[in-house]
Amino acid sequence: MSSSTVLNTLRSKHPKLALLQTCSSFTDLKIIHGFLIRTHLISDVFVASRLLSLSSNSTEYAHRIFSQIQSPNLFVFNLLIRTFSTSPEASKAYNFYTQMLRLCIPPDNITFPFLIKASAEMECVRTGEQIHSHVVRFGFHNDVYVENSLVHMYATCGLIASAGRVFGAMSFRNVVSWTSMVDGYCKCGLVDDAREMFDEMPHRNLVTWSIMINGYAKSNRFEEAVELFEVMKREGVVANETVMVSVVSSCAHLGALGVGVRAHEYVVENGMGVNLVLGTALVEMYWRCGEMEKAVSVFQELDEKDSLSWSSIIKGLAVHGHGHKAVGFFSEMVRLGFVPRDVTFTAVLSACSHGGLVEKGFEIYEMMKRVYGIEPRLEHYGCIVDMLGRAGELAEAERFIEKMPVKPNAPILGALLGACKIYKNAEVAERVGNMLLEVKPEHSGYYVLLSNIYACAGKWEKIESVREMMKEKLVKKPPAWSLIEIDGKINKFSMGDDHPEMGKIRRKWEEILGKIRLVGYKGNTEDAFFDVDEEEKETAIHMHSEKLAIAYGMMKTKPGTVIRIVKNLRVCENCHTVTKHISEVYGREFIVRDRNRFHHFRNGLCSCRDYW
């Protein structure tokens, strides 16, 4: 007799059992439970199992109900194993399995997927392997649902070879089987293997597309994430919010505003609700692509906000140089009752640094400690040192570092070294530089920065010692590259590039160079710190990646079009000066995102006020 038939029979005798069909709250559940205890119906395994299925959100209550069942059957044990397998107490699922075996109740193909899921949740390979042996022992090794669970478990635990062996032995594979393998490869960082399997799949569902696109995004292969999204659309698959978060985040990293705007339009056209995660991703995409006003607009339209979304907009305002606005948003956040997190304080302290708001910065720093009880982290100390350095308070910055309860890290010392360059203080630079190269001896950027400071002072013998140190420690400067989006296509430039239009690009650059020289531009070669003649240095600096990107952008866009460039390293002083001149001569606006911040070039000026 089926459980529903038994329940109907019992309900005819006890009408209140009908409540089991309509129970909608935990309070109702407890009332029904009390009734079952008083009427002794709790001893009926069919009734008790129905009650147990309603208590899946509370492991404690489920366990209490189970303790009142005199003769639990397989259905009851499966319910308990399922409830505990998805809870923080996943290990207890195995206790019920062991108890079930002691009662000589054999498992079925429902039992094992939940036990295997518990192993995956805890990333407990040893237990998972033991369950696998039981799968074989009880003859469920050819059940597709059990096999899919094993593939997922091994992949989640990083044993992709074991997952592959189970997958390879499967006599029948469905879309879940393939998707589990794609997901496993992505989680292990084997994105190319994931894509190969993705391409071999006979059928794909939305989950598969989402996993593959997210795999590219998490592996910093943002262009491929965006390209795969375009393929997905062409195949008629409609994305969901999860896919769009990956796509929008990829656009943010690439600085691909055009693609990002079209992604936003896609969200609206397909009637997707902009939830908190997607909304925050859109906000970040706009400010990372240089559209700060649009970022603020999207943020203000969010139906729901949290500390992370507030932190994002504050950080965006900070890196765009809007220090006062960032502090204003922070004050509004606090006024509305949102609790700032450590990342929020990093963002607002950075805003104070970029905005020259030293007094306000220290006020917020003290608030963080005293009002919110947040112990300063290295990032917060770094903001204070940077803030003092930007204000020219180099001695005060050194004293602050000396009083820190922890040793300074490379970014903190690097911030002070950067200030030494701006204020041309070679004495402090040498002292800080030596400390910095002990802390981070493999970071080429700090050697270059120290060398440039020596170059400003004409200390060529010091530069030579830095170069020798780099050779001795096998330090190499990473290749610089710049990205520019034209008509939805991402173009990447680097020195020595073999772009198909390189001849035209160089001729365009010579044309630009000729025009800005007429208004007084002379190549500043101090960033080419090698002790060679000036003509050779100038040739080197004019092949920098952002200059190639600028020339290409001016070739391919109409006059007056804003040109947006993303660079992986800090913009050098010469490129910064050149871009200011070009913005003035051509009446163009350039938005350049480098490793440190955004630079908005207009009418011969930069938003960073020549400090970056």
Provide a role label for each language-model segment.
Residues 1-174, 179, 183-205, 211-612:
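Terminal (and in a subset, N-terminal) low-complexity or junction segments at the ends
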